[in-house]
Amino acid sequence: MRKLILLLFTGILLFSCTAVGADEGRILRFIYCSDVHYGLEREFRGKEVGSDEVSRAMLATFKLLSETRLPEDSGVGAGIKFGSPDFVVCTGDIANRMEEGVQSATTSWSQFCSDWDSSISSPLYLVPGNHDISNAIGYSKVLSPEKDASSAAGIFNRMMRPAVERTVETFNYQTDKVHYSFVKDGVRFVFMGMWPDAYMRQWFDQEIGTDTITPVVLFTHDPPIADTKHFTNPNGKHTIN
């Protein structure tokens, strides 16, 4: 039976992970985070700051890992330096809902790219969150503008590399899905967008084919049993609330 590891998290969160690769016992190292929510203000280190400042502080901690030794706890790589990560993962909610006082997804995506591209040398893998897909799924108030696809289109362009890049105007929420995978050191890493719905699960089955041996690590923003407010209304005008 294929080994499947599902990484599902909510809230702002960061952790580093080490795992023994299937090939020659090599140790894989990656950093995972989610829900950076550019555009919000929150209390951080005793004062109210923008989430972009929090993200830059988090990115600074990534660099500290290169010289940080793993705990002497008999775990994988115990006592050795973490070193440079093989890759970094962020599972969405890069932008935030456009309530009054919160910046647009256009500005948030620009800030994210500026901060992360200048700080990370390892490959960066992304999937969108619910706030990227509609910019405000689950938010009951009227938004202005109703939608801003900047972060959704940006993630799609980076990860899917279409022949023609999507723009805010051309991005299609129904068809422009983010899903991809790669195998590294005998482990398959699979990225299934915001939520592993029927479409994503069908793609997953096609992607792995008859491979029942390679271990799988799965990244998605929402768990299979997801919050219904994160989805479009199937009735009426098919609005986001």
Language-model features and meaning:
Residues 7-16:
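Bacterial N-terminal signal peptides
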Residues 17-103:
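N-terminal active-site segment of His-dependent metallophosphoesterases
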Residues 32-34, 86-93, 124-129, 192-193, ...:
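Active-site neighborhood of phospho(di)ester-bond hydrolases with catalytic His/Asp-centered motifs
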Residues 36-38, 94-95, 131-133, 195-197, ...:
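Short, solvent-exposed loop/turn segments at secondary-structure junctions
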Residues 41-51, 99-106, 137-147, 228-241:
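Short, flexible/disordered intra-domain loops and linkers
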Residues 98-205, 210-215:
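Extended active-site neighborhood of metal-dependent phosphoesterases/phosphodiesterases
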